[in-house]
Amino acid sequence: MAVQKYTVALFLAVALVAGPAALYAGDGYAPATPAASATLATPATPAASPQHAGTTEYHIVRKAGLNEEKNAARQTDDEQKRSDEINCPDFNKSVHCRADRLPVCSSTSAHSSKQDVAWMLGYGSIQGFSMDDASVGSVSSEFHVIESAIEVITYIGEEVKVIPAGEVEVINKVKAAFSTAATAADEAPANDKFTVFVSSFNKAIKETTGGAYAGYKFIPTLEAAVKQAYAASSATAPEVKYAVFETALKKAISAMSEAQKEAKPAAAISAATTTISASTATPAAPPPPQLGTATPAAVAGGYKV
């Protein structure tokens, strides 16, 4: 079913951001005291297992665990309702699920571990649900789940401080644009929903950011990928919809993470290259340059016009 599989893909998309974010959080946290775990329906992992309990990620998981039993009860009581109606309001609370299933974070395994656990939790969360697979319900669910995914990414970025403050602010504006576009699309006829979403989203994001978002690497990437992923919902075969949706989101979120990790090293390499160019462009120039005319070395040194 389309909505179920889209939900799994979005779990993966969030994990692709959370994984690199965890690498910047550090591995030196001491285990937290297990007092709060008494409220969980399932006991936390044994004390001997290093869970990096001081990280923001762990606390997100702990909060999610407190809501899991309540959410499961609601789903049981409302079997005739669409699962997207039941789950979407609680997406932010249950995105990572139980604390005892959080993988150990390390600089070498966090990224792949989070992809694995995202698939596991995403698949497990859809088992046994009653689902209305109507296209209109699917469209509405996708919009709101994407909006919630943006919210989770924003929260992780603010807490772990991987994403610069300016880009976190832009993410908040993108989230607001999603909300505006989703509302407009929900009210449009079924055949016009995608067109209305794209036009409303473009208008809202330009109004809220003033075009400044184009200066950031991953905002335009995310914008384009979500449109491409949603456009795939017009395909007739569910497996084709899902493959395109998953691929587009995976590439976009991976590109966002990589651009963020490589931004500073790339800037340093660029500066070093400029310095080398400046020192080698003019062969054996006299130490005190007396000429008033700019030399080729000065031009190579990176003067901005």
UniProtKB/Swiss-Prot annotation:
It comes from the Eukaryota. Belongs to the Poa p IX/Phl p VI allergen family. The keyword Plastid does not apply. Residues 1-25 form the signal peptide. Transmembrane segments: none annotated. This is Major pollen allergen Pha a 5.2. Keywords: Allergen, Signal. Coiled coil: none annotated. InterPro entries: Pollen_allergen/Os. The keyword Signal applies. Residues 65-85 have a biased composition (Basic and acidic residues). Residues 65-87, 279-299 are annotated as: Disordered.
